[in-house]
Design a protein with these regions (language model features):
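Recognition helix of helix-turn-helix DNA-binding domains
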Residues: 154-187
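Acidic, metal-coordinating helix/loop segments flanking the phosphotransfer/catalytic sites
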Residues: 29, 43-61, 71
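Alpha4 helix (beta4-alpha4-beta5 surface) of REC/receiver domains from two-component response regulators
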Residues: 74-75, 82, 95-112
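The C-terminal output helix
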Residues: 126-137, 199
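Conserved acidic segment of CheY-like receiver
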Residues: 10-23, 28-32, 43, 62, ...
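C-terminal output helix
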Residues: 97-103, 113-126, 161
């Protein structure tokens, strides 16, 4: 089902919800509408429905329960990275131990929000979209360099691969970090995984 939230001032945010509990789905939908965001919400409850919706609904953000009857958030994230690699993925779950949450974040999930305290959901979505806007502010060449830096290639190797000077690569790298507001390579790698530019190395 697709649900829209009333608000005529902005283009609606397309939210794909992977959830097999209808009561929980209603609570999440209510929280999104309560926040004042204008949304177009589509709900699916299976791997097949999720894959189809990624192609037909083309979501701006994905919200996923951690564990469904025959599907889970890790499998869903893998499918998402194949079909819409840069779309934000936020886990909204009833219960997740810290170790599982950490694994999900390292795998590329944007955040983990507990159903018992969904007041942070709006901020999680806003932060995810802000991260993507900064990515879209980079040039195609800068994204090439970002991928290679995040994948662990040294400056000299990147220059050789792209047919550019070392000085040019250093300039690109400096500008990338400035635009993304990132100050070290470790954080840059995490960002690249988070926005789907490189696969997670678990």
């Amino acid at each position: 089902p697709v649900v829209s939230a009333p608000n005529a001032t902005k283009k609606p945010l397309r939210v794909l919800l992977l959830e097999d509990n209808q009561a929980d789905a209603a609570l999440i939908s209510h929280e999104l509408q309560r926040s004042g965001m204008r949304i177009l919400l589509a709900q699916v409850d299976s791997a097949e429905g999720f894959t189809a919706a990624l192609k037909s609904f083309t979501p701006d953000v994905v919200l996923s329960d951690h564990s469904l009857a025959q599907f889970d958030s890790r499998a869903a994230l893998e499918v998402l990275r194949e079909v819409r690699p840069t779309a934000p993925f936020i886990i909204v779950t009833g219960n997740l131990i810290p170790a599982q949450a950490g694994t999900a974040i390292r795998a590329g999930a944007e955040d983990v929000v507990l159903k018992s305290n969904m007041r942070g959901l709006e901020a999680s979505i806003a932060n995810a979209l802000s991260a993507r806007r900064r990515l879209h502010g980079l040039t195609d060449r800068q994204i090439q360099v970002l991928k290679l830096v995040a994948a662990g290639h040294r400056t000299r190797e990147i220059a050789r691969r792209l047919g550019l000077s070392i000085k040019t690569i250093e300039s690109h790298r400096s500008e990338i970090m400035k635009r993304l507001r990132i100050h070290d390579v470790v954080t840059l790698v995490r960002y690249a995984v988070r926005v789907g530019l490189i696969p997670a190395a678990l």
